[in-house]
């Protein structure tokens, strides 16, 4: 079943169930199970699987409400544990590419990959934050590859660009002339974009085959430890926020963290290091 048919199937599952509440729960659960299996079977190039996965989560919530109305009919309700949004996690940034104030009061770590449509959707949100909190915020980029067949090569290319001091230029080129241009994330296109970014191509190729695979794996491992399961995910001075949310939701956390940082008595240049030192080193479900 292709993505459009799956979406239609999902709508029918939500509005087309008749009978008792218990019957609705049973039928909806079967459909959710079916959709989960289909999502897992989808090609990792298919961004629609990400969309459907989020919709399934929303429908799981509806199923929970139906269960309450049906006197808590027993069923399997798989949930993905997520980090506590009020907790502060230790997310290192040493040596990773960043944009914004070097000694910022607020550090936003963005966990993302280049095959994720929601990661691209969050790109202008990050630009808005950099503009509206100029001098007080920085965005640090770390790789979290969900679709290895399509997202690994551009991650290596972005890493190689960072080694030549041109990460942001390459980052935007990959999105604009790679992902948004027919999702051409091939090595050949990355080399082409590297030339456009002004990279030294022999060094780029060497780094893509040398240090960068290790660096990307290190990012993946570090982010998994603090609870990242999908993309995009963000840590705002160590506080978790997931998904391509409206900029207003980011600003709520940024404002809270900015006020907290300024009132801490800790020098600006030392503040994020204090978070890394004192934050939770691991997410425990």
Regions found by a protein language model. Name each.
Residues 1-7:
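Bacterial N-terminal signal peptides that target proteins for export
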Residues 5, 145-285:
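Cysteine-centric redox/oxidoreductase cores and disulfide-bonded domains
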Residues 9-11, 93, 236:
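Exposed boundary/loop context
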Residues 11, 110-113, 228:
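Processing junctions and N-termini across compartments
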Residues 14-16:
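C-terminal motif of bacterial Sec signal peptides marking the signal peptidase cleavage site
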Residues 19-147, 214-220, 259, 263-285:
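Extracytoplasmic thiol/disulfide redox context detector
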């Amino acid at each position: 079943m292709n993505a459009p048919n799956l979406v239609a199937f999902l709508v029918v599952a939500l509005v087309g169930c008749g009978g008792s509440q218990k019957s609705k729960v049973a039928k909806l659960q079967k459909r959710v199970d079916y959709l989960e299996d289909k999502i897992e079977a989808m090609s990792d190039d298919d961004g629609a699987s990400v969309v459907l996965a989020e919709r399934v989560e929303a429908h799981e919530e509806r199923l929970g409400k139906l269960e309450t109305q049906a006197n808590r009919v027993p069923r399997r309700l798989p949930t993905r544990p997520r980090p506590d949004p009020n907790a502060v996690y230790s997310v290192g940034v040493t040596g990773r590419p960043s944009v914004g104030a070097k000694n910022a009061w607020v550090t936003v770590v963005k966990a993302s990959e280049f095959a994720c449509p929601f990661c691209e959707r969050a790109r202008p949100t990050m630009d808005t934050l950099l503009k509206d909190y100029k001098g007080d915020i920085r965005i640090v980029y770390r790789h979290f590859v969900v679709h290895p067949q399509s997202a690994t090569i551009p991650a290596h290319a972005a890493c190689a660009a960072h080694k030549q001091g041109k990460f942001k230029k390459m980052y935007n080129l990959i999105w604009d002339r790679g992902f948004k241009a027919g999702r051409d994330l091939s090595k050949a296109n990355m080399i082409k974009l590297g030339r456009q970014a002004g990279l030294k191509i022999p060094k780029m190729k060497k780094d893509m085959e040398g240090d960068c695979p290790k660096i990307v794996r290190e990012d993946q491992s570090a982010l998994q430890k603090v609870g990242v399961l999908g993309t995009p995910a963000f840590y705002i001075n160590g506080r978790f926020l997931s998904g391509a949310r409206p900029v207003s939701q980011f600003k709520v956390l940024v404002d809270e963290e900015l006020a907290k940082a300024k009132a801490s008595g800790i020098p600006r240049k030392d503040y994020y290091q204090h978070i890394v030192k004192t934050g939770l080193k691991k997410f425990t479900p």
